[in-house]
Amino acid sequence: MFCAAGGPASPGGKSAARAASGFFAPHNPRGATQTAPPPCRRQNFYNPHLAQTGTQPKAPGPAQRHTYYSECDEFRFIAPRSLDEDAPAEQRTGVHDGRLRRAPKVYCGGDERDVLRVGPEGFWPRRLRLWGGADHAPEGFDPTVTVFHVYDILEHVEHAYSMRAAQLHERFMDAITPAGTVITLLGLTPEGHRVAVHVYGTRQYFYMNKAEVDRHLQCRAPRDLCERLAAALRESPGASFRGISADHFEAEVVERADVYYYETRPTLYYRVFVRSGRALAYLCDNFCPAIRKYEGGVDATTRFILDNPGFVTFGWYRLKPGRGNAPAQPRPPTAFGTSSDVEFNCTADNLAVEGAMCDLPAYKLMCFDIECKAGGEDELAFPVAERPEDLVIQISCLLYDLSTTALEHILLFSLGSCDLPESHLSDLASRGLPAPVVLEFDSEFEMLLAFMTFVKQYGPEFVTGYNIINFDWPFVLTKLTEIYKVPLDGYGRMNGRGVFRVWDIGQSHFQKRSKIKVNGMVNIDMYGIITDKVKLSSYKLNAVAEAVLKDKKKDLSYRDIPAYYASGPAQRGVIGEYCVQDSLLVGQLFFKFLPHLELSAVARLAGINITRTIYDGQQIRVFTCLLRLAGQKGFILPDTQGRFRGLDKEAPKRPAVPRGEGERPGDGNGDEDKDDDEDGDEDGDEREEVARETGGRHVGYQGARVLDPTSGFHVDPVVVFDFASLYPSIIQAHNLCFSTLSLRPEAVAHLEADRDYLEIEVGGRRLFFVKAHVRESLLSILLRDWLAMRKQIRSRIPQSPPEEAVLLDKQQAAIKVVCNSVYGFTGVQHGLLPCLHVAATVTTIGREMLLATRAYVHARWAEFDQLLADFPEAAGMRAPGPYSMRIIYGDTDSIFVLCRGLTGEALVAMGDKMASHISRALFLPPIKLECEKTFTKLLLIAKKKYIGVICGGKMLIKGVDLVRKNNCAFINRTSRALVDLLFYDDTVSGAAAALAERPAEEWLARPLPEGLQAFGAVLVDAHRRITDPERDIQDFVLTAELSRHPRAYTNKRLAHLTVYYKLMARRAQVPSIKDRIPYVIVAQTREVEETVARLAALRELDAAAPGDEPAPPAALPSPAKRPRETPSHADPPGGASKPRKLLVSELAEDPGYAIARGVPLNTDYYFSHLLGAACVTFKALFGNNAKITESLLKRFIPETWHPPDDVAARLRAAGFGPAGAGATAEETRRMLHRAFDTLA
């Protein structure tokens, strides 16, 4: 490993250089010398000698063995004019864009160097041996590699006639004659040397039924089939396979059985070996479509792992002599294909797995973040990578040692000079963190090229950040490829022809989802990890840091970045501090969750690499495991065309996905939570959540059902029984599988019902599954082995050292994840190996188990004497009141049992025994119930929605958002206070329970229970605070995210859009896309009505305006005049029409404006909003009738008339004063009754 780190101080006598210093020096003629400019602070960036025309930067020539930039003498120069600090303000907008003829430069610590020059010292750490074809290894460097750790596996095709083949041993030449697939293992030695091991001899293959092939193609020998295959390829479109011959194939006859159906018997198949993955893909899709292909979509890496027992995708290997004592062959540096320190050629028999080694070598983790800025006329616009003027201005890179978690380096790439604040430097030093190295650049191209050069030279094995897959990487890669035409295939571990790409794989709610593949670099986005592991109302980094790390970052609004950036090096340093601290927080999140450990454990178990584990969903994990086991048992898996491999050709409006890396239909990709209900109605009604389990897949059967809940407030104990691993245990207990299923009664006619097979009706169809003694289920074997492995791993955790315990915990969690994927794997109609009959049977049996449990509990323990017979200890655990036990809810794998006449402590003590009793009585092993928890109070609202307090006092909330981000702080606090009162005040709890026991309609005609007075007092106080003129408006501020341009919204009547247009009309600073817009709802006044009318005209102007950003008018447009209508009999005197009641979205106002102008809040809206939030939670007390709930809650509120301001003024002028009202609606009714009696 070679490393030159740090930023050296300026040599004595040499002037300190900073970005773009000396740009205004006179241009030197060719061949003339130029003296060094005097020391100066870098300010201006514009080069007067930029050529406005020219050629593109020279890419590496064809003779070179690499495609990364190792030399460059001309490039496109783009830099913001805001860096021209001596120029007049009107000249500091936009960007300089031209061509510059010189080598790319970097400035650091007063020194200046070429970005691409490799010397004994450098500004950033390096781990490289070769650069641009030159070997920079120390003299005598010859590392001995015996053991190495593998973290990534690549595959490519080599040809015997290639230049590199001349240096290969004969046995490797045989493997690539005329062509062959080579597997490359990338890893690290214990000493820290980067290694690449090229494994020859791996062959992909597929199966076809021999009888069908012989009948269709008249083949008499395997060689005949090879000739037919070669002919089909030569006739394919294009020139790719023109020279292919039968020598590219080998065919042999084997005996195998189709994995589908019990009655399928072993028969003869052709196994065809193909030397090229592309040829295999074409044949499986196009060769004799009438003949079914088997396992044709399995890539070479999977074949390498599965066909060599014990091989792993992540772990330690040892090089050893192979057959005939043949050793691995070291490659000379001139033949290196990667940026490794040492490379070897070998075959699979030269490799052995070192299973006893479980620690990690010194892999490097890069945590990075970019800051961008729009460079057009509107610098507050959201930057778009395809626009040349929108620039990356800073990139922070934090480099960690993954084995020790130590932060080793902090780098900050800056477009323009940058001085980090002394306070920030002191804070880093006080925490024992390294001092940042600030790298300054004159242009965006130089900065991005330096960043990619650093990535290539340092070669971090793992990369993380926050939303880097959806934003940071796509922005950087788009800039490089679209604006600067830089090829990226050499910037991973491969020196050329490697993959370095991001794909858009669809939309999840309003969040774009992408995947990235970089050869030799594992990208783990912490945004995806956090959304999967933690349930939060907001997933912005600051909110996550507060919730998870108890830390808070120094935030910098995006709208402040342009002003800071243009204000000089010191203010750019503030942006740099912001950029670095984002990366620091993400690094802390990474080492808190350690996602690489769980992902690597899944990769090992499933036999796929980590990148596929991250991005290719759940299906591939189960498929590879099933493929391995099926091969051992003599089964083959049919190829579902185009589903296992990725797309080979570009689809319309979607980037092409290379083979083996595409999104597979049916893969479970958890939806990220959207940030807002954007296109919905203004009141933010709750949407029906799309089930995560389907993830957008087409599921061709009815899913699991639940026992409808008995809604209400239960103050008697409720014990919750859970089925342990419900679906996996059903598959095991009933031996469900593709291979044990039959749809034909005659197939099982020779077997005895119940003893030899299960007969079950699912969806009106009879299905048969043979028992394990007839044929053991492949799925059952997988689950049994996995669960046994998980049990063994968990047993080792308590006795293990802390570091090993963490690793073991991640391994057992990974096994659980894969086990839970098996049921979903079978139930996806367009999945890799669908079997809807199995999935539907699982859910049907699960439903029957819920019903059987309910019937058993109701019959077995209906009387207390019956309970005593099974559990004598219950005699001393009675509670006051009558005894009863009944099921009040069943939710897929949970059963809620309401137990009256028993204490909560009794159920905690007896719960496990009760669960075991039911399991023994009703279910086949390994199905079993477990006592999960016991509620002392439970508010059961609806399916999957409840709030409860378990024994011990902890509150559990499921499916109910007490604190919603689209509610104001006041409503969130009040809602939480009401819930706490309901559960922790026994008087209120008792009254609420009595309330819930009676039909809701009864309470309309009778007073509410006295015990609810404290509950009502909270509502009364909330109403008082809402109507209090001295209230704090900040408590009533709502927010919504501007997720896209206002013109892109289909529903324009949204409150935050109204505020956006009001700000634009007032020529105030408008929010940028992705900003959250704060607003309040104000009362309808004449001024508000006039503003709304003007806004309608402004919306029309903006909708017709070209361009991406709205242009505010010089003055607020006047509303269009309408012809005066003839007054009707309903019009008020004078013929004036009654003003229209404005929509809630039209009443939205900027909080600052409302405070400054004293605009009154709409108290009716806020109280209605509070009641609406309360009704969602507490309607279970009133039979889930929201209308009755709201009506009864209003009883607590004093009735007060709030006339409009103009009406109140007229009343006061006429001598009227405010009349008193009753404290409640009931008292007001009585007062009015007496008044009418008196008047009568």
From Swiss-Prot:
Functional note: Replicates viral genomic DNA. The replication complex is composed of six viral proteins: the DNA polymerase, processivity factor, primase, primase-associated factor, helicase, and ssDNA-binding protein. Additionally, the polymerase contains an intrinsic ribonuclease H (RNase H) activity that specifically degrades RNA/DNA heteroduplexes or duplex DNA substrates in the 5' to 3' direction. Therefore, it can catalyze the excision of the RNA primers that initiate the synthesis of Okazaki fragments at a replication fork during viral DNA replication.
- Subcellular localization: Host nucleus
Organism of derivation: Human herpesvirus 2 (strain 186) (HHV-2)
EC number, as in UniProt: 2.7.7.7, 3.1.26.4
InterPro entries in UniProt: DNA-dir_DNA_pol_B, DNA-dir_DNA_pol_B_CS, DNA-dir_DNA_pol_B_exonuc, DNA-dir_DNA_pol_B_multi_dom, DNA/RNA_pol_sf, DNA_pol_B_thumb, DNA_pol_palm_dom_sf, DNA_pol_type-B
Q: Which GO terms describe its molecular function?
A: DNA binding; DNA-directed DNA polymerase activity; nucleotide binding; RNA-DNA hybrid ribonuclease activity
**Matches recorded under PANTHER family:** DNA POLYMERASE CATALYTIC SUBUNIT (PTHR10322), DNA POLYMERASE DELTA CATALYTIC SUBUNIT (PTHR10322:SF23)
Question: Which keywords label this protein?
Answer: DNA replication, DNA-binding, DNA-directed DNA polymerase, Endonuclease, Host nucleus, Hydrolase, Multifunctional enzyme, Nuclease, Nucleotidyltransferase, Transferase, Viral DNA replication
Instruction: Kindly list the GO CC terms recorded for this protein.
Output: host cell nucleus
One Pfam family name is DNA_pol_B
This chain belongs to which protein, by name? Answer: DNA polymerase catalytic subunit
Per the record, where are the segments of Polar residues compositional bias? 44-56
Subunit structure, interactors included? Forms a complex with the ssDNA-binding protein UL29, the DNA polymerase processivity factor, and the alkaline exonuclease. Interacts with the putative helicase-primase complex subunit UL8; this interaction may coordinate leading and lagging strand DNA synthesis at the replication fork.
